[in-house]
Amino acid sequence: MNSIYIDIELSKTGLKIPKFKSGKLIHSKYDPEREAINLVNNIDENSFYLVTGIGAGFFIKKLLEKYPDSKIVAIENSQDDIDFLEEHFNIISELKNKNVIITTTENLYDSLLQNYIPSIYPSFKLIEYR
């Protein structure tokens, strides 16, 4: 497996969070759910979101709660990264929703062609999560 993630750590609130090979964490070490809520509260409503970095899915779940009718394409660097997140966080089943598409950078072009229809989703927002 050639993932950008190497391990998991527990946050101060007891939640598992992925750790990059660099040693950095993708989420807050203290309260990743609070971090996700704060980030979502600073995002205006759009009909289509492209989110780079899935992590444990805290941010995407909160974004879905706030904007349930929006379409979200969530990107990870590789299938190995998605496999790591699925193994440790059940990310595919956790984010199972008709409005969420999980993809890799390699498949991003096709995912956007299949899912982004400007007449249906007139506003588009890129969110670089970490």
Predicted features, each with a name:
Residues M1-R130:
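N-terminal donor/sugar-recognition subdomains of glycan-related enzymes
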